[in-house]
Amino acid sequence: MMHLYWVALKSIWAKEIHRFMRIWVQTLVPPVITMTLYFIIFGNLIGSRIGDMHGFSYMQFIVPGLIMMSVITNAYANVASSFFGAKFQRNIEELLVAPVPTHVIIAGYVGGGVARGLFVGILVTAISLFFVPFQVHSWVFVALTLVLTAVLFSLAGLLNGVFAKTFDDISLVPTFVLTPLTYLGGVFYSLTLLPPFWQGLSHLNPIVYMISGFRYGFLGINDVPLVTTFGVLVVFIVAFYLICWSLIQRGRGLRS
């Protein structure tokens, strides 16, 4: 039985990876171009007029945040659009009636989102080498933060895909929730620059912890304790996973 589950999992993974690789011009190139513009405008043009941040140039400071931003948006978008597309075309019904556990379905879609997020993250990292020298303080924290964040936002994208009723619903969360939280998550600034009230308010933003942990992996500096960073990641991953599992298990909005 486990062999059959493994075959099902690999099949979903293969389908999801083939899906975004087949249209790589739409899925991989745009985020690379967008991040390149960020590097040029904020890093070179504006960054040259801004002083050092915690002993690093402004460009070095924002690179980890921009990489994380690309991972978050692409992991989320991949699963949200793919799962809703399967639901819209009623392909998901075939998967639900097949002898495939809900855990396998979730792992398959999340695996595809993680793959796209990491792939884009690697491409953006490669582009950043044209602007700043490569520096890693801890590979363990870089890899751990990157993978956990990609898993979390893949689950969030799956949740969006379950609730979405139209294709417009797929863009609502990224536009009104994800983008503001990312920009206010410390990508372009350190929390220490904010007044105490806004520092405290920023700690309610979960993306702050992810960017802080990822920046520590590269530069060895962080705005929040690492234990808190990984605690927040694990709690959100478990919560989102259980919600997704419950909704798919009950077929909420999936069965006609």
Swiss-Prot record:
Q: Where in the cell is it found?
A: Cell inner membrane
An example Gene Ontology CC term for this record: ATP-binding cassette (ABC) transporter complex
Q: What are the residue boundaries of the ABC transmembrane type-2 domain, all occurrences included?
A: 22-251
* Gene Ontology molecular functions: ABC-type transporter activity
What are the UniProt keywords, alphabetically?
Answer: Cell inner membrane, Cell membrane, Membrane, Transmembrane, Transmembrane helix, Transport
- Major subcellular location class: membrane
Q: Which residues lie on this side of the membrane: Periplasmic?
A: 1-22, 74-94, 138, 191-223
Report the membrane topology from the UniProt record: Multi-pass membrane protein
Mind telling me which residue stretches traverse the membrane in this protein? 23-43, 53-73, 95-115, 117-137, 139-159, 170-190, 224-244
Query: What is the protein name stated in its UniProt record?
Result: Inner membrane transport permease YadH
Protein encoded by which gene: yadH
